[in-house]
Structure formats: C-alpha cells, structure tokens
Amino acid sequence: MASNILQIPFRRSHTVSLSTALTQYISTKYDQRPDMFADDLLIIDRLRNEAINVQEPHVSGISRLVTYAAQLKWLGGKFPVDVGVEFPWYPAFGFNTSRPVSQDNIRFELANVIFNLAALYSQLAFAVNRTTTDGLKQACNYFCQAAGILAHLRTDIVPDMRSAPPEDMDEMTLRSLEELLLAQAQECFWQKAVMDGLKDASIARLAGQVSDFYGDACDHAVKSNAISPEWIHHMTAKQHHFAAAAQYRQSLDCLEKRKYGEEVARLRDAVACVNEALKESRWINRTVLGDLQGLKNRVTEDLKRAEKDNDMIYLNPVPPKSELKLIDRACMVAAKAPSQVTDAISMLGEKGPLGQPLFSKLVPYAVHIAASIYSDRRDRLVNERIIGELENMTDKLRDLLSSLNLPGSLQALEKPLGLPPSLVAHAEEMRQQDGLNRLRKSLLDIAKVKSNDRAVYTEGVELLAAEKAEDDASRRKFGTDRWTREASEAAAPKLYTTAREIDGYFTSAQSSDNLVEQKLHDSEAVFRVLTGTNRDLEAFVPSSRRATIPPEVEREVSRLRSCISEVNRLESRRKRKAQAVKDKARADDISSALVREAARLEREFPMQAIQASQFEDLFESRLRDYDVDLDMVAQEMHDQDQIVAQVRDANRAFTRAHTGDASTKEREKALQELENGYLKYKEIISNIEVGRKFYNDLAKIVGRFRDDVKAFVHKRRMEASQLEQDISSVAAMASLNISPIRQPPQQTVVSAPVSVSAAASVPAPTHFNPVKPQPQPPSQAIPPQSQPQPQPQPLRTPLTAPQPTRSVPQVTPGMWSPEMGIRFGPGGTTAQQSQQTWDPSKGMKFS
C-alpha cells in the first residue's frame, strides 16, 4: 500500500549452528568441558532462531531481538569476535540483496540484529494508525527509537567489528537512515500540531525542521552505494514539499499580521518549492504526489488572491527571496535508543528483564587478555633485568679483553706461524652465515618495518591534530560559553601522552640504529677478511720469528692464560644460567591462578565485566618469584668485578715480562683485530635482533594507538555534531512562541486522516456576527480579534490555530484608508458611503 513515509526493510538470515562453533572453541581454547554448558548451547541457538524469524511488525519481536543482542554482547566478554562460525545475512539495501554477506564475527552478527531492531521500530511506526493524535505520538516515539538504535549501531557497534562493515551499514548509509527516521518523526509531530490547531508560525517552524531532516538524509544518501534512487527521489520531494509547507504557513502568519508584501513573497517561494518537488513526480508514489498536488492547488489559489489584493488594495512592496527572514526551526525529536540496547548487559541477571546470562561459568575472555599482559611483563623483566644485564656484563668483559689485546697477544707469542684454531673456527662460522650480506639484508628488513611503523604513527598523530583543529575552530565559532566540552588534550590525555612516548621511542631508536650502522661501517673491512678464504686470513696475519720463551715469561703467560680460561668459563656459566631463566619463564603458566581469581571476582562483583586491570595484585605476586634470579644477577656482577681485577693484574705482569720484537707486535695486532671483528660481528647480530623485536613490538603499539585515535576522533566528531545541534535547537526554541487560542464553539474536531496537503491548508473560517457598518476590503468582511493575548503553554497542550484575519482599524470619517477599498459614486454623508461599497463582480461604473 502506498504511503507518504518509508519503512526500513529487515535483513534476512538462515539457520546456522552457533552452538557447534562455541562447543569447538571451548574444547580447544578453554580448560572446561563443553558439556558443562549444554543447556546454554541449546538456548543460544534457540535465541538466534527466534531473532532471525522476526520479519513482521509486531511488538513481540522487540523482546526477541533485544534478548539475543544482549546475550551476544555478553558473549563478547567470553569469546573473541572470530569464534568460528560464518554468520550469513542478506543486505536490506543495495543492488544485490539476493546474495548473503557472511563473516566469522560475533560483532557482525550483533550489528545485523541491532539493525533489524531499528527496522522493526520503523515498521511499527509505519503500521500505527496516524489519523489520531495518540497514534501520531506513538509513531513519533517509534521513529525516534529506531533512529537512536541506528546511531548506537553506527557509533558503538560497527567501529568494534574489526572488519569492514557491509555496504548498507557504512557511515553514509546509516547516517542517511538516521536522518530519514528523524524526519518522519518530526513529520508526525508536525502533523499532530496541525491536528491540534497550533499557530501558523509554530507549524511553519516544525515544517522547516522536517525539510532540513529530509535534506540531510538526502545528502548522505547520494554518498551511499546502498540507498536506492527511488528513496533518494522520495527524500528530495519531501524536502522541497516541507520547505513549501513551511513558507505557506509562514505566509498565513504574515496575512494575520498584515504583512501583505511578505505574504506574496513567501507564497511565491512556496510555489517554487512545490514545483521543485514535482520534478520528482516520475519516481514518487501516488500518495506523495497527491499531497504535492493538493498543496500546490492550495498555494496557487492563495497566491492569486494575495497578489490581487496587494496589487489593487494594499500596494505593499514584495521583498525578494534573499531579503526574507529565514524561518526559525523547532526541532522536537531526537534519536534515543532504548535502554535494553544501550545498557543490555546490566539487564542480564537472575531477575533481570533480559534473562540469565549464558556461559556465566565460563572463564571470561578478559582472563586471556590478563594472561597476555602478564606474559609481556614477565618477558620484559626477564629480558631486560636478567638476560639483558647478563649480556651487558659479558659485553663489558669482552671490551676489556679487547682493550688489553687479549687473547691476540698470547696467540702471537704461543703460535708465531699459521692461524690459531679459534680464529679459523670463527672465520668458518661467519662464512657459513654469509656474514656481511646477512647483516646488510637484516638492516634493510628492519628499515622497512620502521618505515611502516612511522607511517601508522603519523596517521594517528595527524588525526589527533585534525580533531584538535576542528575543536578549536568550533570553540572560536560558538564561544566558550556555549562550546562547553573539554579541549582535545584534556579529553584524551592518555592518547597525547602515548603520542609523545612513541615519538620518544622513534628518536631513541634512531640513535641506536645510527650506532649499529656505524659499527658495521667501521668493521666492514675486517668482516671482508673474516668471510674470505683461509689464504686471505694468512695474508692478513703476518708471521713472526720463532723465539725461545724465558721461564719468567712462561710463568706470566700461564697465569694470564688461566685468567682468560676463567673468563671463558664465566661466559659459559652465564649462558647456562640465562637459558635456565628462559626455561623458567617459558614454564611460568599463570592461567590456573587467573581462573581462580576470576571466579572470586565474579562471586564478589556479579554482573560486572571483568577487566584485566583487576589482576594487578596477582601479577605482582607472581613476578616476585623472579627475585632470586635478580639476586643471581647481582652476584654475577660481583664475581665479574673480581675476575676483571685478576685479568688486569695478570696482563700488567705479562706486559712487563714480555717485550717482543716488531714482527710479534704486528702479528699480535692483526690477530687481535680479527678477534675483535668476530666479537663485533656477534654484537651487531645481537643488536639487529633487538632492533627487529623492538620494531615488531612497536608495530603493535602504533597500530593500537592509531585505532584508539580513530575511535576517539569519531566519538569527538559525534559529540561535536550533537553539541552543534543542541546549540541550534536552544536558539530555535528560544524564539518559538506557541500559545493556546480559544476556539469558537462552531468549529468541530477533525476526525479524518490529515494528509500533507490538507494539513498545510488553513481551517475554514467560522461565522461572525456583523459589527456596525464600515468600509470593507474587497475580499471578505472579518471583524478584528477580540480575544485577550494568550500566554505561552507547553507543546503537549492541545491547541487550535487562530483564524487568519485582517484587523480593521478605526477610520476617521471622510478620510480614505487601504482597508476601505475603492468606491465610486456620488458624494454623500459618511453613513451613505458606508453602505455603497464596490462589488467586483459588477465591474466599474461611472456616473
């Protein structure tokens, strides 16, 4: 059946076994058996089947949809979004509604259910009897709730889907549908105002707001790939229709206030708006077209009458459209989602209106997040304060040996010819690893990861800067008295702090990267020798003449060799201890402790979503198990100090006892340079691995930062839009003047449906008792208003529209005024003149 309003169609789905996927996930990811939740698994499938079968506009469908949606929100705290089942849903809009879109995403399922809830409310409004004031109130309320549900879907659910929304759930489509629903809600309020007989000026303001809503809906619809052209034509026609209705009602107000020139101007604009709307006549239904034709007929008739009166009687100048004051808006509707949608989880419980939460005994998903957080902290403790410290001490020990030319000085003395076996082994290791090329390739890979991290971070920072600029511009535009929300940095201090911290990470990391590249550049020549052949090594290391070692030198050599062997044993022992700590951390499973703590929290704080931050005390307790390893690091540092002192003493004694010739010194220098080169190679590899891990971890941080910024900016822009609307509404309501008028007893209550065209017209004039004879205008004789000045009343009070009248002022006898009209005839007394008025139907006669 054709109608002058639209209803949102349902999205359709078919049956899938959600319980099967949940069973599989519980059995593989949790420490609990799926059969413990057999009843819950049956219930969740039943709830889904009931929800997807809501395809008719009946109020019973509301409870089915909100109950299933609440359970889906609850499951979001127990399971990840990709639980393992493809949810198929057929689009409600677009050019391919016969092919379903499927996603393994609980949030996608929730979005479709919430969309259908909004569609249900819109269809309930469509089905309401809108010929009565009660029906109009109910329809208006349904439309507002449908718009609120779509706003909740757009701002709270779709951004958390972690996947691209369907084509008919994108930003522009949802915004268009929201504005359309608000337009139809405002239209219901406007229609009720007409039925209640409000003042023409008030009805004009209401109609103007209806036109604005339809205009916004159309603007967003043309940017959507899903809204059909028929709907766009409908919105366009309604936008111009209500612009015409607003001007028509304002013209009636001008007529009442004797602004005859402005009346003509507004009627002309109303005709122009109607003609603009009629350009869509090929694509709109007969009901909308009939309303337009009825309005056009009414406006055209009034325009002819007004132009004739003004041209022949009043002679008021007709202002151009540009000089007409814009009609104030009166927005009487707002998007408001039901509490069962916005506060669904709080309504789940043993006695909650939405039933008992399912899978309440299942370990919450937040527990797994907490386990991940603990693992990160434990690994940071182990890697930085234990393993990292041990490696730093070892590096310092190697630096000491290198500064003392050890073991090169001993090797040059003990083996004056050929290559030491340790050097040959080191060179072979580097050749097998393709040492120099490996280092260069690793640095290039790290540079790519760093570039990606920087791009993601820059995107987040630019979004923050853009939002701050928008907020500052709005604050300058509206002033701090009206733009009362927090400044950007005050609204999101953590985001700005995180941005500065990440920038600091990049700065410090760049210094480290430059240092590693400098190390590679300085040691590149030695690396080429070490990765070459043994002949290259022999050519690099000069031989020295064989000499007899004196006993005193032999004694110092033996002592120094013993110290170096102790250093090697210390390094080996450290590697074993570091590996033991790594194994300990790998076996450190906090899951069971988290489950016990989660059960305690659920008992003490029922219906409160468990957050990972609630496990802080448990984290601290478990990390204290590594205090013994921290003590071991301190002991290792003490032992190293002693060994370093012994090495220094032994080397000083060896240096005093051993002088050596020039060839020995050259061989000693070459061997030490190669030994240092190998150690530098191992050091650079370690640095590269640290850098690789750093930038990979930083990728997660900057990605999370960018996502948080996107969510914050989206929320702030929604707040700004709402605040601007509130400011505009306050200004419009301040100028809104609505008051009750006494209705003559002859007027009857309208019982027939009020169409758009009929509602835009003026109620028929009532009968009046004549006053004393007086010159009348050429239209109809209407006495001046005698009612007292009405007082403003709330909008909910039924009102009647005043009859459009022209007040007739007292006229001085013998003096012409525009209200007297044009009269021809012989002169006479004032009394005679008052009875001889001109009849337009008789033409002009001269005597």
Swiss-Prot record:
<dbReference type="Pfam" id="PF03097">
    <property type="entry name" value="BRO1"/>
</dbReference>
<feature type="region of interest" description="Disordered">
    <location>
        <begin position="763"/>
        <end position="847"/>
    </location>
</feature>
<dbReference type="InterPro" id="IPR038499">
    <property type="entry name" value="BRO1_sf"/>
</dbReference>
<dbReference type="InterPro" id="IPR025304">
    <property type="entry name" value="ALIX_V_dom"/>
</dbReference>
<dbReference type="GO" id="GO:0071467">
    <property type="term" value="P:cellular response to pH"/>
</dbReference>
<dbReference type="InterPro" id="IPR004328">
    <property type="entry name" value="BRO1_dom"/>
</dbReference>
<protein>
    <recommendedName>
        <fullName>pH-response regulator protein palA/RIM20</fullName>
    </recommendedName>
</protein>
<feature type="compositionally biased region" description="Low complexity">
    <location>
        <begin position="796"/>
        <end position="806"/>
    </location>
</feature>
<dbReference type="GO" id="GO:0000815">
    <property type="term" value="C:ESCRT III complex"/>
</dbReference>
<comment type="function">
    <text>Required for the proteolytic cleavage of the transcription factor pacC in response to alkaline ambient pH. May act as a scaffold protein that recruits the calpain-like protease palB via vps32 to its substrate pacC.</text>
</comment>
<dbReference type="GO" id="GO:1900198">
    <property type="term" value="P:positive regulation of penicillin biosynthetic process"/>
</dbReference>
<feature type="compositionally biased region" description="Pro residues">
    <location>
        <begin position="772"/>
        <end position="795"/>
    </location>
</feature>
<feature type="domain" description="BRO1">
    <location>
        <begin position="4"/>
        <end position="397"/>
    </location>
</feature>
<comment type="subunit">
    <text>Interacts with pacC by binding to its two YPX[LI] motifs.</text>
</comment>
<keyword id="KW-0175">Coiled coil</keyword>
<dbReference type="GO" id="GO:0005768">
    <property type="term" value="C:endosome"/>
</dbReference>
<feature type="coiled-coil region">
    <location>
        <begin position="256"/>
        <end position="312"/>
    </location>
</feature>
<dbReference type="GO" id="GO:0042318">
    <property type="term" value="P:penicillin biosynthetic process"/>
</dbReference>
<dbReference type="Pfam" id="PF13949">
    <property type="entry name" value="ALIX_LYPXL_bnd"/>
</dbReference>
<dbReference type="GO" id="GO:1900376">
    <property type="term" value="P:regulation of secondary metabolite biosynthetic process"/>
</dbReference>
<comment type="similarity">
    <text>Belongs to the palA/RIM20 family.</text>
</comment>
<feature type="compositionally biased region" description="Polar residues">
    <location>
        <begin position="829"/>
        <end position="839"/>
    </location>
</feature>
